[in-house]
Amino acid sequence: MSSRVLTPDVVGIDALIHDHQTVLAKAEGGVVAVFANNAPAFYAVTPARLAELLALEEKLARPGSDVALDDQLYQEPQAAPVAVPMGKFAMYPDWQPDTDFIRQAALWGVALREPVTAEELASFIAYWQAEGKVFHHVQWQQKLARSLQIGRASNGGLPKRDVNTVSEPDSQIPPGFRG
């Protein structure tokens, strides 16, 4: 099991039990990580450092300002939902995925890091308009999610190479080969 030690000072539990005052006095920052059986067990903290940490926690718990903002500043009007055709429909030029498309795609097993770009959406719509197939709105979104997943992964996430550039050979000799 991996763990993270949050101080550079580390001591065994036996050394702490033997002379805890000396160990804590030598500790940088007033904190020592105590290990038992080669694993971190707990932290020993000097009273002064503990007082500093508690004061800091109290300070951070208080609001940074006494200015109270009006709640109406946070109540944004709900966006009017886009009218989605009922039932199955053929792809049309103004089709848009739902606003929570990325979340829905994650539910379908497609992890999208960035939202769909205008170019990707235009390409998808143009392809499926020409096909003339009909699907429900959710099915169109699922097709878009899969299309984005395949399209973005096809080149390992790298931008497409310019076919007009002349490639340059690598002049390095790999280890184990003679030149």
Curated annotation (Swiss-Prot):
> What are its GO cellular component terms?
primosome complex
Q: Where are the transmembrane segments?
A: none
* Sequence segments annotated as region (Disordered): 154-179
Question: Could you tell me the superkingdom of the organism this chain comes from?
Answer: Bacteria
Keywords, A to Z? DNA replication, DNA-binding, Primosome
Q: Which Pfam families match?
A: DnaT
Give GO BP annotations, semicolon-separated: DNA replication, synthesis of primer
Q: Which Gene3D superfamilies match?
A: 1.10.8.1180
Annotated NCBIfam families: PRK02854.1
- Self-association and partners: Homooligomerizes. Interacts with PriB. Component of the replication restart primosome. Primosome assembly occurs via a 'hand-off' mechanism. PriA binds to replication forks, subsequently PriB then DnaT bind; DnaT then displaces ssDNA to generate the helicase loading substrate.
Q: What job does the chain carry out? A: Involved in the restart of stalled replication forks, which reloads the replicative helicase on sites other than the origin of replication. Can function in multiple replication restart pathways. Displaces ssDNA from a PriB-ssDNA complex. Probably forms a spiral filament on ssDNA.
Family, per entry: Belongs to the DnaT family.
Q: What is this protein called?
A: Replication restart protein DnaT
What is the gene called?
dnaT
